[in-house]
Amino acid sequence: MANKMEKMASIDAQLRQLVPAKVSEDDKLIEYDALLLDRFLDILQDLHGEDLKDSVQEVYELSAEYERKHDPKKLEELGNLITSFDAGDSIVVAKSFSHMLNLANLAEEVQIAHRRRNKLKKGDFRDESNATTESDIEETLKKLVFDMKKSPQEVFDALKNQTVDLVLTAHPTQSVRRSLLQKHGRVRNCLSQLYAKDITPDDKQELDEALQREIQAAFRTDEIKRTPPTPQDEMRAGMSYFHETIWKGVPKFLRRVDTALKNIGINERVPYNAPLIQFSSWMGGDRDGNPRVTPEVTRDVCLLARMMAANLYYSQIEDLMFELSMWRCNDELRVRAEELHRNSKKDEVAKHYIEFWKKIPLNEPYRVVLGEVRDKLYRTRERSRYLLAHGYCEIPEEATFTNVDEFLEPLELCYRSLCACGDRAIADGSLLDFLRQVSTFGLSLVRLDIRQESDRHTDVMDAITKHLEIGSYQEWSEEKRQEWLLSELIGKRPLFGPDLPQTDEIRDVLDTFRVIAELPSDNFGAYIISMATAPSDVLAVELLQRECKVRNPLRVVPLFEKLDDLESAPAALARLFSIDWYINRIDGKQEVMIGYSDSGKDAGRFSAAWQLYKAQEDLIKVAQKFGVKLTMFHGRGGTVGRGGGPTHLAILSQPPETIHGSLRVTVQGEVIEQSFGEEHLCFRTLQRFTAATLEHGMRPPSSPKPEWRALMDQMAVIATEEYRSIVFKEPRFVEYFRLATPEMEYGRMNIGSRPAKRRPSGGIETLRAIPWIFAWTQTRFHLPVWLGFGAAFRQVVQKDVKNLHMLQEMYNQWPFFRVTIDLVEMVFAKGDPGIAALNDRLLVSKDLWPFGEQLRSKYEETKKLLLQVAAHKEVLEGDPYLKQRLRLRDSYITTLNVFQAYTLKRIRDPNYKVEVRPPISKESAETSKPADELVTLNPTSEYAPGLEDTLILTMKGIAAGMQNTG
């Protein structure tokens, strides 16, 4: 036992040696990490007994030994130990490692925030030039004015006219339950406070107790979602971030922008109606491949958001009434207050209010005016609530706020009056914050985008033309479709009546348009058409909006995803802009969405990244030619394989001219928690997007040299060929993929409301991009990210050795190329082909082993060539912090990888025999009852007891360790 303790102590010492000298100053990561793990292991011993804790440490030690030498024998030893646990013990051990990875993530977040604060205190805004940190708004403004010699006024004008629209989507990549996310938040808070400078010994003791309590509560919560979420659940989960961080985070961030402006000599605040940050959502609006998003769901989600918005305003209005107790006001406000006072009943009492429930006297004019706002907010909230619960409401719509201008008007009146009476300082307090919230969130909190596949609209049009007996729309050429759609758009007659024969699918599409027509227009953002290829796709939606009587039609946004669609997108847009009717309809503004996930799945990361770059350049040229302002909407996932990566780098590496002060970008799944899970994270996210968008517009990145483009074009052809020859043309690839990864078991995690496939049968092309990336992330082989890079580098360097120098020059001088390479390098730092080899040996049929070996040799070759291009001796040598943090995690992730491989073996091969020892964990230390009660949480599993839960826990743990799922 003593020997074991020494071993554990020696691991801590090794971890300390891992830290390069440069890193160790004021670096508390290891301290935080060790504290959380100590507390957790104590809790584990208290709950499940000393034997179990020792087993967890033994497993960790074996894994750490493997990490030191990468000896495959150690993985086998680890496998033998893991398979000897009985069902209950397996679940507890897998859960322990998953839990420890979540704790490591929390320690890291607190440490990053701590280090950033320390630097800011010293007035150091610069950050290490690595991928995990970014510049803040103050530094960006100073850089533009002092280094780039821009005038402060020019910077201010650009800033107040730019817009970043963050679109929250329910992509099924958030694998941690909300119950756990909340507990994690409390652990984070305890940690932050424990390291505060002015903490007393008593505080420390109480915080330590709270920390242990939260760690235990998280460990005792079932990590596995037992039922899949509905779209309404996803919406509520997304909206909880507004409640917890975004609502208060926006005005706080805008105050920081005001301060930063003051420091470059601008003595004005950002106008409250400047659209710096906007929020949209796909939750309950994205019906692409998700049959569970029905018109009723869309209606519910909109009403729910309106109710939540009214509730948030309502909860703040009384504070504002308390604050504005002044009697001095301008004539305009006095007249309004007198009028309201006259019209209110003499002894009106409002017993449902806590404060200001009696009639407000006239010598408090601001309170009189705000009292009327409060009454209207109350009715607005109640109306949405009744409509949501009962489908009807007796409160008339005109007694509520129906548009934002109506809501802003009395608030602006108060603001003007305060300024006129010399009370600008008071006006710029809570009232300004409130005005900014109203301008940002409106009455609907977020604007809901609707997304639908273009084929579904084509089916509706086909039904209409057949019903009118003028032929089959589906069989018409693009020219004929456009001609007919335009003649209908210009004409006035209704296209169809109630006698149109409708399938369920057609009814669903038409009812969606009817819901859009029925609800207030400020509920909605864009109508996005996925798999859009031609102008008729856009015109069809315009016509359907008119037919269903949508008073303020939504802007229609084509989404281009596959490689071929991206190549033909500029031509399709030019054809659309050549239509006079359409140019008149859009008022000089168009939005185009580009998809990162499916383009990556279709051609591999290298070619997709380059094609996305070129498509944006060409789309902007088309828009400029027709005098249209184009907004690019980036559909990025969280993982590198789906376009993810650090925000500011992703923005700064976009082609010049393509952002131009307006940007829309999706924030998906687990990225929502990483961006908005905590107040400081929310602040940092808003800051990153705003600063990077401003910098990209005012200091555009350099355009690539013609010879760089030529080389990229050559390499993209090679990379696509290599990627497709394996993924689509290798006859047994799909079989290998399904055996070597947990793709077939992914659906059991219940993390999203939509199916994993667009169609139930079929190969890779029907699989959604998320499970495709998820499966490779789980085995730490990351094939979709790197496949193609190696072949491209090898062939161009073999052709001419000078190309290696050119690639190095591109890496050093061209932000887009550097970001692309750095992100793949980071993925290599997280990868381990040894784990993929173990999966092959256990799960893949022998005749496919050579194929697996061939892929692993490609992996090693790609890694070697990538390092040559970046002129690095080893992976991540330019980023010691990130390297250290990844190495702290490796042993935990490896344990879960081995657990997963052996559990899959037992699930898939009923003849696989293991020697199981007697149970060692107790249900709790006080009883001698074994922990196998955990097995009863999943009574309907079709596998041997405990296997399915163990598998899901390993998937969740690995996702936490890799810090992404799909």
UniProtKB/Swiss-Prot annotation:
It holds the Pfam family PEPcase. GO terms for cellular component: apoplast; chloroplast; cytosol. Its EC number is 4.1.1.31. GO terms for biological process: carbon fixation; leaf development; photosynthesis; tricarboxylic acid cycle. PROSITE patterns: PEPCASE_1, PEPCASE_2. Its cofactor is Mg(2+). It catalyses: oxaloacetate + phosphate = phosphoenolpyruvate + hydrogencarbonate. It is found in: Cytoplasm. The active site is at residues 171, 601. One of its GO terms (molecular function) is phosphoenolpyruvate carboxylase activity. SUPFAM superfamilies: Phosphoenolpyruvate/pyruvate domain. PANTHER family: PHOSPHOENOLPYRUVATE CARBOXYLASE. Belongs to the PEPCase type 1 family. Homotetramer. NCBIfam families: PRK00009.1 (NF000584). This is Phosphoenolpyruvate carboxylase. The gene is PEPC.
